[in-house]
Regions:
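Positively charged, helix-rich recognition surfaces that bind polyanionic ligands
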Residues: 1-152
Length: 152
C-alpha cells in the first residue's frame, strides 16, 4: 500500500549496536593490557637487582566517585601479577612496601618528613633546599626503603 513504511526489526539494530559497543570495550581492554605488558617488559629488560612497589589501597580509591572509573581502568592487579611473573622469570627481587609508608612525604636527601603535603602539590620542596618532582622523590624513597616484604 502507498504511504506505509516498511516494517523493520528494531531489535536487530539495537543488538548490532550493543555488539559494536561491546567490541569497542574489549578493544580498549586489550589496548590497556598490551600497554601494561609493554611497560613491565621495558622495566624488566633493564635488569635491575630489585623492583619496589607500593601496596595501594585500590578498594579505598574505588570509593571516591570522581576517581573510581579512572582507577578501575588502570589495571593495577594485571600490572602487579604481570610484574611478579616477569620478575620470577628473570630472577629479579620484587619488593612491596606497606601502603602507609610515606614515600612522597619524606625528603629523599635529608630524610625529613613533610606532613602538610597535599595531593595537588606536584613539586616537593624541602627546607634543606631539595626541590624536585613529587613522583621522582617518591621513587627515590621507594628505592631506599628499609621495611618491605619480598613477593618473589
Amino acid at each position: 500500500k502507498r504511504g506505509e513504511q516498511p516494517v523493520t526489526n528494531k531489535r536487530a539494530n539495537i543488538n548490532k549496536n550493543i555488539l559494536r559497543v561491546q567490541k569497542l570495550h574489549a578493544r580498549l581492554a586489550n589496548i590497556r593490557l598490551a600497554y601494561v605488558k609493554s611497560i613491565v617488559n621495558d622495566v624488566v629488560k633493564t635488569k635491575p637487582t630489585f623492583i619496589t612497589v607500593e601496596d595501594l589501597n585500590v578498594k579505598g580509591m574505588m570509593k571516591n566517585k570522581h576517581l573510581s572509573k579512572a582507577v578501575a581502568q588502570q589495571c593495577f592487579y594485571a600490572f602487579k601479577t604481570w610484574l611478579s611473573t616477569k620478575c620470577r622469570e628473570y630472577g629479579i627481587e620484587l619488593r612491596q612496601v606497606d601502603r602507609f609508608y610515606p614515600s612522597s612525604k619524606i625528603c629523599s636527601c635529608c630524610g625529613q618528613k613533610k606532613s602538610d603535603l597535599k595531593l595537588s602539590d606536584r613539586v616537593y620542596t624541602c627546607e634543606c633546599g631539595n626541590v624536585m618532582d613529587r613522583d621522582l622523590n617518591a621513587s627515590i624513597n621507594l628505592l631506599q626503603a628499609k621495611k618491605y616484604t619480598i613477593l618473589t
